[in-house]
């Protein structure tokens, strides 16, 4: 009963701003105000009292009194004789003593041992494993706690029970860092385990932070549940409930993978195994940037969706296994319905138009070639005719000149 009353009084004192009386060990939160009462001091001046401090801020005992000056912003004596620390820091840890003399001459001493604390943020497990392999060391993850004072400790739990490192099946690598300015601590704890063959298949791990001061509750991380697989070496088989991966089959709906524009195609990868394998999708030989899943839905199929699809199933105890490939194609729709062999439709019209344009261009090119060839022949013919005409003119001139000479001779010899 007495112990309960003491604890209740302690909590009441701290809730009222940290005011305490008597010889006590007290804790104060960093950054909060703390008031220490000087027992036996008169409530009003004149007062005969003296405070002596030995903390991280002092090299020896420092003396404060009501008549003296306050110690900067660190501490000062209140009118009622109490000592006020406006914002407690790590350097304020230490011993505080007050000696007061009442008006009747009775002397009273008060001694305090002050420790400070800071609650860190909730711890968390970073880089957690996705699965564990039986019989070999595995890293479960790293537990991190930041911003606490004093440092405290980190503990790992398996299925709610504390794990004790034994250097064999369980090992822990710890690291403690202190911030150079704030003095607060950051803790790291890396857990390595070697699951036993035939042990639990779904162990649950968690981590807790235990403060360095008593009467402070622990902080816990969110639990993580991992799957344990057996090690396939030396002919050892899988765990009892494991089913090996067999043939991977890819089913397409509608059958054949042919669909009208805007239709829907559903691809289902069937890979029976226990546990279920991870399934990734491949199109035209390239992996698709999609999350793993056994079903691929292609709504409102367009030209960009056409191609060859396959799925790859990856099982922890096997290598990746790929299914056969299936093709997804678009069939055109005519005015009277869907016909696979129809010559109508925008696709064929575009093809016919393209062929017509190409044919016209070819005809024009042929005509231009014929015209150029014909003109070249005409030029060559004209070049040949020019010399022939010149020779004929010269011959004609020669013929015309020859008959005139004999006639002239005859006329000259035919006189009386």
From Swiss-Prot:
Keywords: Cell membrane, Cell projection, Disulfide bond, DNA damage, DNA repair, DNA replication, DNA-binding, Endosome, Glycoprotein, Immunoglobulin domain, Inflammatory response, Membrane, Nucleus, Phagocytosis, Phosphoprotein, Receptor, Repeat, RNA-binding, Signal, Transmembrane, Transmembrane helix, Ubl conjugation. Endothelial cells. The chain crosses the membrane at residues 353-373. Residues 389-408 have a biased composition (Acidic residues). Residues 23-115 form the Ig-like V-type domain. InterPro entries: CD80_C2-set, Ig-like_dom, Ig-like_dom_sf, Ig-like_fold, Ig/MHC_CS, Ig_sub, Ig_sub2, Immunoglobulin_dom. It is a single-pass type I membrane protein. GO terms for cellular component: cell surface; early endosome; nucleus; phagocytic cup; plasma membrane. Disulfide bonds join 38-98, 143-207. Residues 123-220, 238-327 form the Ig-like C2-type domain. The keyword DNA-binding applies. Constitutive homodimer; disulfide-linked. Forms homooligomers. Interacts with S100A1 and APP. Interacts with S100B, S100A12 and S100A14. Interacts with TIRAP. Interacts with HMGB1. Interacts with LGP2; this interaction plays an important role in AGER-mediated pro-inflammatory responses and cytokine release. Interacts with double-strand break repair protein MRE11 which is a core component of the MRN complex; the interaction enhances MRE11 endonuclease activity and promotes DNA repair. Cell surface pattern recognition receptor that senses endogenous stress signals with a broad ligand repertoire including advanced glycation end products, S100 proteins, high-mobility group box 1 protein/HMGB1, amyloid beta/APP oligomers, nucleic acids, histones, phospholipids and glycosaminoglycans. Advanced glycosylation end products are nonenzymatically glycosylated proteins which accumulate in vascular tissue in aging and at an accelerated rate in diabetes. This is Advanced glycosylation end product-specific receptor.
């Amino acid at each position: 009963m007495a112990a309960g009353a003491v604890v209740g009084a302690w909590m009441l004192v701290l809730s009222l701003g940290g005011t305490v009386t008597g010889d006590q060990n007290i804790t104060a939160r960093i950054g909060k105000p703390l008031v220490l009462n000087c027992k036996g001091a008169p409530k009003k001046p004149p007062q005969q009292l003296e405070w002596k401090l030995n903390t991280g801020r002092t090299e020896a005992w420092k003396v404060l009194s009501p008549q003296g000056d306050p110690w900067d912003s660190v501490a000062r004596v209140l009118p009622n004789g109490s000592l006020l620390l406006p914002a407690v820091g790590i350097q304020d840890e230490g011993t505080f003593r007050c000696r007061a003399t009442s008006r009747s001459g009775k002397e009273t001493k008060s001694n305090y041992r002050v420790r400070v604390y800071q609650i860190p943020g909730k711890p968390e497990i970073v880089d957690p494993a996705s699965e564990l392999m039986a019989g070999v060391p595995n890293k479960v993850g790293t537990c991190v706690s930041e911003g606490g004072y004093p440092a405290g400790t980190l503990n790992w739990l398996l299925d709610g029970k504390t794990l004790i490192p034994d250097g064999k099946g369980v090992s822990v690598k710890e690291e403690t860092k202190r911030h150079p300015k704030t003095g607060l601590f950051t803790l790291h704890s890396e857990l390595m385990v070697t699951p036993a063959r035939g042990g639990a298949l779904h162990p649950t791990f968690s981590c807790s932070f235990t403060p360095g001061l008593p009467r402070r509750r622990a902080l816990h991380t969110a639990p993580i549940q991992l799957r344990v697989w057996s090690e396939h070496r030396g002919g050892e088989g899988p765990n009892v409930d494991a089913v090996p991966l067999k043939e991977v089959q890819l089913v397409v709906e509608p059958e054949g993978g042919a669909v009208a524009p805007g239709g829907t195609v559903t691809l289902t990868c069937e890979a029976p195994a226990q546990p279920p394998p991870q399934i990734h999708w491949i199109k035209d030989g390239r992996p698709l940037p999609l999350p793993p899943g056994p079903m691929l839905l292609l709504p409102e199929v367009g030209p960009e969706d056409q191609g060859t699809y396959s799925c790859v199933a990856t099982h922890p105890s096997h290598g990746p296994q790929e299914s056969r490939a299936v093709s997804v194609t678009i069939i055109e729709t005519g005015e009277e319905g869907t016909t696979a062999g129809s010559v109508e439709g925008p696709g064929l019209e575009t093809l016919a138009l393209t062929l017509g344009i190409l044919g016209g261009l070819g005809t024009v090119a042929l005509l231009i070639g014929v015209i150029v060839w014909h003109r070249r022949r005409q030029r060559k013919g004209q070049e040949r005719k020019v010399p022939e005409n010149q020779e004929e003119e010269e011959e004609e001139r020669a013929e015309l000149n020859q008959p005139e000479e004999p006639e002239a001779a005859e006329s000259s010899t035919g006189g009386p």
